[in-house]
A protein has these predicted regions:
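Acidic Gly/Asp/Thr-rich repetitive segments characteristic of extracellular carbohydrate-active
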Residues: 13-45
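Extracellular beta-strand-rich solenoid/capping regions of secreted or surface-exposed proteins
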Residues: 30-39, 52-79, 87-118, 124-145, ...
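Short glycine/acidic-rich loop motifs that flank beta-strands on beta-rich extracellular proteins
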Residues: 41, 55-57, 83, 89-97, ...
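Leucine-rich solenoid repeat scaffolds
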Residues: 310-351
């Protein structure tokens, strides 16, 4: 607390109505977020405890595609007292799912900025939906700058756990995700551990590092150009996915759908249905120094998923696969490998 207070005004959430004894803390937290934002910004400090958020009671439709519990505002940071013992627990049944923290730049008429989330757990294992959609996330932001997501645990989200789109100068660091996309089935949208939609700016610079994604649905980590839904190629430049662990995912570990100038390096990927994946005309993508082990499908795949979506068969360009290690992958090492521009100095064992 004292260290935080040197930089920004700190609001102890307990002093503003949040309480582990409450049956629903949604209204109290939203009121506090609004207060901090209107006062010029600061830190909401959440002490140790389990805080309930009732999605059945407190969800509301932000847009026709987004159902929210709390709306995040600029210059408001959330920091917990304990990574494992400050728990925001979402419960309740909704028709299509709802997200605990939402922001949409078209709805709010502003880009979200300076909103850090750090050192707490979001547990959605008791939140359910009747019809699977992409809505049931821990974080659901669109249009954000200058934000940090660090030291978080995101548990059993029905849809993507950290589903944040259109990022610039954003760091995602040391986030543990278990069962992101718990309710996802093949053919559904979203359902990843970390899912980043791209395509608002020419340069969308962000880093995903030191994260652990376990038993996720569609992908462990997934970058997706949103032009695919409008038959366009936006392909913003400049992302890094590095030093992450992805295991036991039901589809592929790391996927790049569209995009330009992406570095995927030094990731430890094992026991997934598939390893690395690119499609929708992605270009200038470098996969370097990754370990891909015990994939049930391809350890590396170029573009054969969902071709019915606006010509997803667009050919990828300048895909580089170098310095990776492939171990005991059961089926294909490569699919459509003729599109690779460079394959060199990879290690292959017992494939």
């Amino acid at each position: 607390m004292n260290k935080l207070e040197k930089n920004k005004k700190v609001y102890n959430a307990i002093d503003y109505g949040l309480n582990p004894k409450n049956k629903d803390n949604s209204e109290e937290l939203q009121t506090l977020i609004n207060l901090v934002h209107n006062n010029g910004g600061g830190v909401i400090f959440i002490p140790i405890g389990v805080y309930i958020f009732d999605s059945a009671k407190s969800s509301w439709d932000m847009t026709k595609n987004i159902t929210a519990i709390c709306e995040m505002k600029s210059n408001v940071s959330l920091i917990g007292e304990s990574l494992t013992d400050t728990i925001l627990k979402v419960i309740g049944n909704t028709e299509k799912g709802s997200a605990l923290f939402c922001h949409n730049s078209e709805f709010s008429k502003e880009i979200l900025h300076s909103a850090t989330a750090k050192n707490f757990t979001i547990d959605m294992s008791e939140a359910s939906l009747n019809q699977y959609t992409h809505r049931g996330k821990a974080f659901y932001y669109s249009g954000i700058k200058d934000c940090v997501f660090r030291d978080l645990r995101l548990i059993s989200t029905p849809s993507t756990a950290l589903g944040i789109d259109m990022l610039d100068n954003v760091v995602i660091d040391s986030v543990y995700i278990y069962e992101g996309g718990r309710s996802w089935n093949y053919g559904g949208n979203g359902g990843a551990g970390i899912g980043i939609g791209t395509g608002l700016w020419e340069n969308e610079n962000y880093v995903i590092r030191n994260c652990i994604c376990v038993s996720c649905g569609h992908f462990g980590i997934f970058l997706e150009d949103q032009g695919i839904f409008h038959n366009k190629e936006n392909f913003p430049k400049g992302q890094i996915i590095s030093n992450n662990i992805v295991r036991n995912c039901r589809h592929y570990a790391i996927g790049i759908r569209g995009g330009d100038t992406v570095l995927v390096s030094a990731n430890n990927i094992y026991n997934n249905n598939g390893g690395l994946y690119v499609d929708y005309g992605a270009r200038n993508i470098i996969f370097n120094g990754n370990i891909i082990k015990s994939s049930k499908e391809a350890a590396f795949c170029i573009g054969n998923e969902d071709k019915i979506i606006n010509n997803n068969s667009k050919e990828c360009e300048n895909i580089v696969l170098t310095g990776n290690t492939f171990i005991e992958n059961k089926i294909n090492l490569l699919k459509d490998s003729e599109h690779l521009s460079c394959i060199e100095k990879n290690n292959i064992f017992i494939n």
